[in-house]
Amino acid sequence: MAWPDSVMNKKSGLSLPDDRTITISVIAGSSNGLTHQLTKARTSIGRTGGSADIKIDDEQVSPLHCVVGVTYDMVRLCDLDSANGTYANEERVQAAELEHLSEFRLGSTWLVVTIVPRHFKDSTWF
């Protein structure tokens, strides 16, 4: 599936919704336990030492591996032509839509996205 340039373009008009908190957490791999609450609509993920917003300690992850773009009603994952690929639902993808508790893999690192309404103080509602 082709992905709009707007996901990678920093001036795309993407915006975080004010009624939800979106978090990406490492659930398996050497960076296990790392949690990052998204504070902007375009967030890059890559290997430690690179210029990515979220840095993963995994040699199989490219310095700029993928980007997560957020609109009001959608969270999008887009591979940035990484060497080892981005995987969602056990398939290598160029792009994928993520929902609450969607898991994806970069190298040997597994991550999960959580989308929680802001009026909940924690994620125990699910």
Feature map (PLM): residue ranges:
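Intrinsically disordered, low-complexity acidic Ser/Thr-rich regulatory segments
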Residues: 1-59, 69, 118-126
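Forkhead-associated
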Residues: 34-110
